[in-house]
Amino acid sequence: MTERVDFYVLPGAAPNQRWNFACRLTEKAYLKDLRIVILSASAAEARSLDDLLWSFSDRSFIPHQLVDERPPDADTRVYLAAAPGAPPAADLLVNLAARLPDQWQRYPRIAEIIDADEERRRLGRERFKTYRDLKVPLETHAAPDDVRHHG
C-alpha cells in the first residue's frame, strides 16, 4: 500500500536534468538500504539511465540491474524498468514514465519527477489528481538549488 507520493518539480525541461535528479534521489535511498525501482518511459531511456547510474557521480556509482533484459536478481537493490508492465516490488518507485505504473499501490513510496516540459507537466498533474482522488498522501517539493543552477 502506498504511504506517500512525493512530486519533485524541476525548473527546466532537459532530459538530463530529470535523469540526474533521479540518480541523486536513487543514491540517497540506496544509502538508506532501500530497494528502488526507476521506471523509465522507454527502453532507450532505461539504457541511458543505465549508463548514467555508473557515471553520474565522481564519488560513487549505484549498482543496478535492467529488469527488461533478465529476471530480477534477489540481491539487487536498484532496478531499472521500462514502461509498460509491472516492475519488481521495492520500497521506492521513482517514476519517470508518463503514466501510473501497473500495480503502483504495492510501492510504499513513489517519487514523481516533473520538469518544465509542457506535456510532462500536464501528465504529472493528471497523476497528481489521480493520487489525490484515491486519498494517497501527497507532498510537493521545489527543485533544490543545486538542480536549479546545474541542471
Task: Tell me what each language-model feature is.
Residues L39-S42, A81-A83, V94-A97:
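Short His-Asn-centered micro-motif
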Residues P108-G151:
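Glycine-rich, aromatic-bearing surface loops/beta-hairpins
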Residues V37, L92-V94, A111:
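Conserved beta-strand elements of the Class I
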Residues M1-A46:
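Long, hydrophobic N-terminal alpha-helical segment
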Residues D50-A89:
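Helix-adjacent hinge/juxtasegments
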Residues A86-Q105:
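SF2 helicase motor core recognition
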Residues K32-R35, E45-I62, L134-P137, G151:
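Terminal and domain-boundary regions
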Residues R24-L25, L53-S57, I110, R127-T130:
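Short, solvent-exposed amphipathic alpha-helical segments in soluble enzyme
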